[in-house]
Amino acid sequence: MAKRVVSPNPMLSLETENIAKMGTLTADSLGSMWNVFTKCAENLENGRRLENISWRLWYREAMMSDANDACQIACQESSVPDLSSSCDSINSTVESDAGHVVDSNSFNRIDNVSVNAPIVNEVSLQAPMKGGSHSSIVRPQAKRSSSRLLSTDAFSQFISSFSPPEKPSMKDLALFHGNKSPSSKETIPKVSNSNSSDTSTDDQAYLNVSVSENEHADRSIKTHSSAPPLNQQKSSTSVNDAVSKAIQLVKSTSDLGSLSTNTSSTAQKNKSRKPTKSFSDAVAAASRAKELEKEKLSKVTVTPDDSTSIIRGFDPRLPVLSTKNVSHEEKSHSVQDDKSKQLLKPNPTQPYFYLRGSFDTGHSASSSICSAAVDSESVNSADFPHRTVYDPLPTHAIAESISQENVIEDDDDDDDAWVSVDEAESPHFTKRSPAPYLSKSFRNSALSLLLSQDEKLQHDVRSASSAALNLPRDTDIKATPNLSQSGNINSDNSDLSNYPYNDYRVYRMSHCSSNSNKVLASEISESLRRDLLWERRQKAAMNSAVLRRQSSQSSGANDDKEVRNRKVVEKGFANDCSVW
């Protein structure tokens, strides 16, 4: 019996257009489809699915018949639907061609396509009909043969491409030894022995023995065969014995060659003692590779100074950290680089400078105070020319800012002091409070900041805040520079400890920005747009109120509805007036 060839990749691929073109309702096409899909299911793309479809079509054609034809069938008839076109005998030429579908190399023979085609015998029904009524008609129960005829013409109609089968043992060995270099592998041909004579020819053809450098040290030879377990044990033992004998012969010949290298007669004797060329060359190459590897390992010396280690599975492509002696100057440079990197990296344990403090109860002291600013001694202005480093506030300024937060809690102008800073001259800070301007978008603007500053100047808010902060007597409030007029104040010349931190520092930074005019112009236009929108809403509300009033007067409603509408309009007007 021919053995079924199982390959890891599908060898046959079908085209759906060709299957659709052929007559799928004829018995001949159904028989050929069923034959190919069932016999070649493991070597086809989507073979299992096609096999299932072909079985369903075959059962439908063989066991079902039309309802009109079923009424005309006589009760005594016992026959299956007409399948004569596929059951007829085929000429000997066609049978010879069906055995070899594709003629390629010697190992590219498909045994699963060759089908022995016996003629289907006629089958009779087991239960004869008793009456002439159509209700007692029994469907024919036919025993079909497992194999049917297949011609090369029907086969070539829906086979689009064919790839030769691969030896499974070769692919598995390649996957198993994929991490090793191909130069270290040597394939040894098959060694015949009387003990392995009962193995099949197909199994011996697929037998492969791979000998690598690392496996020679342990005298372990791995064999891969597609034979059953019993035959595999016999063949492996015979091959192991043959290879061990060959290695002993090669050793003996190498010893004799080393003793008598100067004389030509001894060299000829050693050549005559050697076994066949192909086998001895393979084993000799493996032994040479083993000796080279031993020499490489002997050259490697492990000392306490050079901390090198031989690790199994070491990948030389990965970079290795060198542990050489480093001079004192290089160490100092590396320490300075590490310090500069540490200064730039954010430290989560220390609070950082915020452009505007987050006015929470838990983080009010840490966020509004520049307590974690870098010391002026450690960071020079020459090292970071593009950054503006602010000196830390003294302790009394910190206490004053904390007391100012506790005293001035009802003033909403402190919360509105959020201004965008120029990107070119950004202050030295690492993170901001989580977007405080999103909660009150119409109050946190440069325009509202200017208006609030004017209100402070008019109502003399500074005198109240200075009295609450207990400033020194010699410092006069009028001597403090007017920040609304002097916008180009240098941060290095001004002493930050003389000003309340939350009030003046942020405002001074806002006027140092170069795009303040653009920001103000855009905010004024936005405020005008909001004014127009508010007027439209008021007009719409008034029109709706007038319409409601007219409808209520026409219907004879009371005056309470007019008062109610007037209250609604006044309430909406009061809500929409809070634009600033």
Swiss-Prot record:
Positions with biased composition (Basic and acidic residues): 326-341
Listed Low complexity bias regions: 192-203
Region (Disordered): 161-241, 256-281, 325-345, 472-495, 544-564
One GO term (biological process): regulation of nitrogen utilization
One GO CC annotation: cytosol
Record's compositionally biased regions (Polar residues): 223-241, 256-269, 481-495
InterPro entries, per database record: AreA_GATA, Ras-cAMP_regulatory
Pfam families: GATA_AreA
Record's protein name: Uncharacterized protein C1420.01c
